[in-house]
């Protein structure tokens, strides 16, 4: 009497089986209580024993026939034979012992019924060797329970014969007392047994015939094999033996165990705990033809370990240059040279058109960020372990790095201060974009250590990245190629003109290595601007398209005319140069990367002289003013492919009040150093195709602490080059408080070129 899952309980179908069980158990119990005691004394003690054994056998077979699986075939899935359900023929013929047997398609179970299988309309299942559905046992009679049903009929018939026979003996011996209770109950049991004896004996005889002939009730009723040969018969004895002694057929449908549903309820507003080591999430990205597999490990514990990291780690190890990859471009330089800081870092282009043509380059070490008021000392540079590196890749925009590229530098950044004005609000927006740009590079995270200047107050802003903090991956022009590291000697990140240089050593050199010039302790500064020679960014043109180079060539003539105008301006101002407004990030390190003769440094005056100086808001040199206007307008058209926090410094540079700055002096030891090798040029586009940007010879003054206001500063409007401020893009030297500069000034020409889509590039000559 197994019930298929999902069917409703129908109480009416249990009425026949409940009646049969009640009559069987009730009548037999009355017989054993009221009749068997006298039969035991008068006839034989074997009478109740015999009837008891037969009764137990009847109950056992009845239970097996009722609760046993008759051989139900499992239904096919909805989509398993969906096509066959519409196109399959209704019948198929198979050979059984050389006889064609027809199989019918079952539209309910979605398969062809095996031979002798039929679908039960009551149970709604296809049953193997289906005989019939018996309501007295409330179950189908099939291959697996037919044996117990047949034995139930035989034992029940024998039990009924015994009850009627021994009851008749008791009544005949108590004929004078028919009104007695024992005689009345015995006569009632005899009537019930005799009433059901006729159909039971008839049904038993019918199944005896079917068993001996090897047929089922369904085959007999439907007329199968009538007048023909039954392919399933085994002979009379063989059929009886097969029914009574054959092994039990396997069960095809196994009901799942009904276990109590354990549901763990958690109170609301509580987030589930994250695993400390979650499995990496593989993300397949498709953008601009580039597909990269990224492994992101998101876990709460990895973020917690970042804060728990000790702050006593040493500086990062020198880079390991991979030989054999673009050997013409990656020449292994000597340590300490300018090429050693540049050859191992390449930049991926920010324009989508260049993503398809990026070769893989080896990576270099990552140098920590410095913000205003914050500086990373050399020997105490802090790096995190690899276990925390890969766990910090919580990025809102996944990077598009190549799959074979190792972990890049994801730079630690601090949230900006609350905006106090419109300029601060604009700088905060730029800083948030810079966070996204810097977080696209997964890898080494560097902790920061704040540093305050000795004589200046802490600055109110924070910056995002330092000149040599971003990793480069190929040789195209992009946001990061303008941020290549400067001299191996290393410089302090200028948080403000008032912040001085603390003894920072480059991660590429040992703190005590040869060639590291001595650095005196910072002295008190005077409120003047120090020398700020400009240096071009070492960029590569290997991956530039022909369209960009054609645009470069088209603008060559116009830029040559502008250079002539700027040369006239240089003759007017002598040793003055064209610079941006003094900001914290316009003072960058790059002097060792330049080419050309040295020139004396410029000494800057106060902000009032800068504004009132020639070429800035005055009519002393209209030609220079026109060239500066056209230059700033072309620069300002650069798309914001990536943002930085330099606009915050521009806001501070425009604020009224005196500007503390580093002195315009050098130590005698630094003045006599030879010029290091120049920036390597691209083998593809070097020579006549390179053009120049304004950069005049700057006379270097002798060491002095006097404030000179002779030469005003030329100021260009704040603009962005390839998504960054020009001060950061040109990598000027980092200036600290009065004292020796980190690197001598060198003359270099830089060309600003507009590419496809308005992108502006700087090309060094």
Curated annotation (Swiss-Prot):
Widely expressed. It is found in: Golgi apparatus membrane; Mitochondrion membrane. The active site is at 134 (s-palmitoyl cysteine intermediate). It is a multi-pass membrane protein. Keywords: Acyltransferase, Golgi apparatus, Host-virus interaction, Lipoprotein, Membrane, Methylation, Mitochondrion, Palmitate, Phosphoprotein, Transferase, Transmembrane, Transmembrane helix. Residues 104-154 form the DHHC domain. According to initial studies, defects in ZDHHC8 may contribute to susceptibility to schizophrenia. However, additional studies could not confirm this. The DHHC domain is required for palmitoyltransferase activity. This is Palmitoyltransferase ZDHHC8. It comes from Homo sapiens. The gene is ZDHHC8.
């Amino acid at each position: 009497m197994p019930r298929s899952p999902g069917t409703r309980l129908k109480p009416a179908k249990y009425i026949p089986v409940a009646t049969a069980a009640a009559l069987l158990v009730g009548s037999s119990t009355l017989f054993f209580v009221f009749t068997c005691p006298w039969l035991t004394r008068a006839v034989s003690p074997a009478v109740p024993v015999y009837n008891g054994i037969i009764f137990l056998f009847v109950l056992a077979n009845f239970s097996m026939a009722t609760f046993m699986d008759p051989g139900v075939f499992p239904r096919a899935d909805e989509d398993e034979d969906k096509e066959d359900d519409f196109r399959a023929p209704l019948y198929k013929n198979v050979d059984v012992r050389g006889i064609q047997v027809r199989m019918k398609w079952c539209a309910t179970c979605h398969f062809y019924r095996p031979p002798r299988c039929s679908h039960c309309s009551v149970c709604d299942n296809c049953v193997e060797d289906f005989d019939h559905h018996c309501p007295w046992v409330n179950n189908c009679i099939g291959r697996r329970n037919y044996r117990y049903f047949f034995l139930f009929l035989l034992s029940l018939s024998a039990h009924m014969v015994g009850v009627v026979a021994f009851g008749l003996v008791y009544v005949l011996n108590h004929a004078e007392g028919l009104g007695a209770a024992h005689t009345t109950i015995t006569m009632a049991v005899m009537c019930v047994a005799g009433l059901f004896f006729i159909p039971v004996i008839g049904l038993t005889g019918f199944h005896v015939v079917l068993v001996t002939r090897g047929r089922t009730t369904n085959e007999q009723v439907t007329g199968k094999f009538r007048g023909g040969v039954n392919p399933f018969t085994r002979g009379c004895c063989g059929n009886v033996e097969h029914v009574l002694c054959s092994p039990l057929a396997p069960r095809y449908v196994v009901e799942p165990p009904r276990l109590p549903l354990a549901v763990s309820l958690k109170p609301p507003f509580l987030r589930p705990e994250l695993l400390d080591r979650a499995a990496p999430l593989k993300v397949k990205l498709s953008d601009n033809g580039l597909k990269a597999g990224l492994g992101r490990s998101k876990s709460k514990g990895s973020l917690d370990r970042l804060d728990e990291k000790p702050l006593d780690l040493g500086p990062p190890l020198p880079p390991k240059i991979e030989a054999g990859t673009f050997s013409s471009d990656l020449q292994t330089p000597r340590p300490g040279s300018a090429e050693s800081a540049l050859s191992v870092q390449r930049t991926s282009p920010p324009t989508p058109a260049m993503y398809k043509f990026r070769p893989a380059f080896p990576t270099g070490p990552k140098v920590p960020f410095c913000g205003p008021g914050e500086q990373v000392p050399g020997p105490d540079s802090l790096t995190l372990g690899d276990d925390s590196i890969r766990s910090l890749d919580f990025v809102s925009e996944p990077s598009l790095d190549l799959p074979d590229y190792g972990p890049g530098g994801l730079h630690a950044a601090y949230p900006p201060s609350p905006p106090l004005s419109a300029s601060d609000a604009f700088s905060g927006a730029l800083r948030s974009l810079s966070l996204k740009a810097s977080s696209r590079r997964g890898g080494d995270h560097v902790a920061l250590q704040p540093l305050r200047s000795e004589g200046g107050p802490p600055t109110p802003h924070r910056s995002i990245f330092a000149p040599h903090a971003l990793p480069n991956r190929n040789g195209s022009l992009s946001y990061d190629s303008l941020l290549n590291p400067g001299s191996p000697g290393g410089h302090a990140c200028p948080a403000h003109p008032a912040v001085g240089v603390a003894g920072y050593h480059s991660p590429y050199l040992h703190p005590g290595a040869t060639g590291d010039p001595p650095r005196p302790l910072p002295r008190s500064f005077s409120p003047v601007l120090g020398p700020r020679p400009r240096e071009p960014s070492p960029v590569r043109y290997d991956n530039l398209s022909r369209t960009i180079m054609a645009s470069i060539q088209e603008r060559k003539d116009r830029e040559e005319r502008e250079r002539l105008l700027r040369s006239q301006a240089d003759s007017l101002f002598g040793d003055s140069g064209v610079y941006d407004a003094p900001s914290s990030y316009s003072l960058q390190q790059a002097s060792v990367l330049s080419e050309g003769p040295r020139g004396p440094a410029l000494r800057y005056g106060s902000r009032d002289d800068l504004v009132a100086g020639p070429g800035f808001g005055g009519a002393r040199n209209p030609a220079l003013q026109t060239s500066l206007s056209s230059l700033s307008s072309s620069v300002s058209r650069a798309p914001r492919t990536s943002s930085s926090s330099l606009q915050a410094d521009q806001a501070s540079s425009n604020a009224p009040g005196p500007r503390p700055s580093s002195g315009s002096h050098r130590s005698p030891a630094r003045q006599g150093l030879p010029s290091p090798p120049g920036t390597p040029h691209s083998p593809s586009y070097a020579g006549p195709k390179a053009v120049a940007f304004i950069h005049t010879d700057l006379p270097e003054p002798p060491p002095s602490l006097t404030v000179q206001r002779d030469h005003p500063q030329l100021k260009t409007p704040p603009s962005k080059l390839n998504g960054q401020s020009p001060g950061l893009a040109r990598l000027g030297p980092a200036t600290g408080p009065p004292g020796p500069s980190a690197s001598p000034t060198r003359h270099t020409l830089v060309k600003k070129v507009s590419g496809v889509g308005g992108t502006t590039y700087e090309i060094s000559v």
